[in-house]
Curated annotation (Swiss-Prot):
Gene of this entry: adx
Annotated protein name in UniProt: Anaredoxin
EC class: hydrolase
Lineage: Bacteria, Bacillati, Cyanobacteriota, Cyanophyceae, Nostocales
Family (UniProt): Belongs to the HNH nuclease family.
Enzyme Commission number(s) of this protein: 3.1.-.-
Superkingdom assignment: Bacteria
Organism the protein comes from: Nostoc sp. (strain PCC 7120 / SAG 25.82 / UTEX 2576)
Length: 76
């Protein structure tokens, strides 16, 4: 079960989506339901700030977590 993230964490996710205009950084779709995705997973000690996040559309975000999509974190 996903734990509820602290306010500062949710704030950073919203900031990165705003900075990237809710545009997926993989497929370039603009989607109002875009997700703030961690480059280094939060559960693995990744920070909860915009330097460790990118915007993904729900489809690409799901594909990533299913292992169907690879993201080169050094590209960002």
């Amino acid at each position: 079960m996903t734990q509820k993230r602290p306010y500062e964490h949710r704030k950073a996710q919203k900031q990165v989506k705003n900075l990237e205009s809710y545009q997926c950084m993989v497929c370039w779709e603009v989607n109002s339901k875009a997700n703030g995705h961690h480059l280094i997973p939060y559960s693995e000690g990744g920070s909860a700030d915009i330097q460790n996040m990118m915007t993904l559309c729900p489809s690409c975000h799901t594909k990533y977590h299913k292992g169907e999509l690879k993201i080169d974190i050094h590209r960002f």
